[in-house]
Amino acid sequence: MTLANFIIAGTEKAGTTSVFTYLSTHPSVCGSTVKETDFFRNGYSGDHSNDALQYVKYFANHCGQKTIVMEASPGYLGSGMEVAPRIHALIPQTKLLFILRNPVDRMYSSFNFHVGKLNIRKDMPFSEY
């Protein structure tokens, strides 16, 4: 059964998408069908057999014999207290990479990303965000 053995976590607007994309180009690496599976926040039930069957869907049909099978879900960092034991229960040998960014730079990037998308006025200054 093919499950992730490498997870990229971190925070929003820190580069998880870029790292996921770059690593996915390596011939030994297989990325999940959806970059942010968020499985261990939203899909995990605590039923080991069922969870494995649900999680494998992100990798089973395209990873073949790749050595590194990965996903990237930035939301895992903020939910660490609940997510860490879930990851350990299902895939205890997996490696995790946490990507962080200067908080001010991350917030400014988030502001620019969300302007016009989350009911944030396009003319709102960053200082009001």
Protein language model features and the residues they cover:
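PAPS-dependent sulfotransferase catalytic core
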Residues: 1-78, 86-99, 103-129
